[in-house]
Amino acid sequence: MVTLNIYSIIKMKRFPKRNYLRKTKVSFFNRSQRHFSQHLNIDIIGPLFKITRKDEKHYNFQYNDGLNILDTPFNNDDDHCTPGKLYFSDSKNICKYLGFGDNLRKISLPIDNPDFKMTKCLYGEKYGANMLIFGEKFDLDKVETYQKMILMDIDIRAGNDNAMIIAAQKGNLEIVKFLVESGANVKSQDNCAVRLASEFGHLDVVEYLYKSGANVKADGNYAITWACKNGHLPVIEFLTSVGADIKAAQNLPIKMAAIGGHLNVIKYLVDRGANISTDNDYVFNIACRNGHTDLAEYAVSLGADIFSDGCYGIDHAIRYNHYKIVDKFIGT
């Protein structure tokens, strides 16, 4: 069986030389019964790719090298991310989907197979087929993959620098540096890269992005707020040193730290002026709700009024069976 990818078809048809990152309309014609049962007129941009997870499964379908044939009826509608299709995208758009997996697979289509079916999804620049041929596999956690992407005419800035943002979220500094040096904007999507790097505790990435021009106070001091929620004290210390506001949004960082139960972060913020009694002793209330006895004790030591009208901490402790806290503050 002859199998070709779309990029090869374009070159074989001896079309005028062009930039293959530009949109090229490729038509499939039903010239005989051994080709297609219908005419497909779908816009394809360059070579084709798919993102897969480590186990290379999706909707319980196991992908393998070579030909993959859908084992359920083909879903011929234009919905996306629904069962009944094997999904893929093109070189202009594949980087929009990097967050959905761990591998980049180069694919081709068995266009000479009379049973081959394909549709374009209504939302998102991707396609669905009942057959795909898996070629090379590239690890999305290796910088070499992104270097090869450029050689394969993949738009590494697709989705408003989605590749850089995903790398920042994962803490892959080498990839972040490569993408920035290749033209990615560290401020894309309201400084999303530094916000996510902070949220997930990747100090080296946060420092690099800040030095490269990212705004650590973007989106209402999102970076320090979510670093507090997840207890990333080294990131919090750095963000504070470069101007992040620990009192942002009515002391939201200390409230988020309380939700996460991070006493060390709470103490750090209090030492720098955060108000532990904010919002009717929210810190004490949420500590009781989540069973964080040490945090509840610390809040009381700094003046939390456990019997005030707006303080529901003890009620929460009783409701959620945190009897150690109940015994601590009101006895048996």
Curated annotation (Swiss-Prot):
Signal peptide (UniProt feature, chain positions): none
Record-linked InterPro entries: Ankyrin_rpt, Ankyrin_rpt-contain_sf
Cystine connections: none
Record's keyword annotation contains Transmembrane helix: no
Domain of life (superkingdom): Viruses
A Pfam family that the UniProt record links to this protein: Ank_2
UniProtKB keywords: ANK repeat, Repeat
Gene3D superfamilies cross-referenced by the UniProt entry: Ankyrin repeat-containing domain
Ranges occupied by ANK repeats: 159-188, 190-218, 219-248, 249-278, 280-308
The keyword Repeat is assigned to this record: yes
Coiled-coil boundaries: none
PANTHER family cross-referenced by the UniProt entry: ANKYRIN REPEAT PROTEIN, GH09064P
Name of protein: Putative ankyrin repeat protein R896
Organism listed in the record: Acanthamoeba polyphaga mimivirus
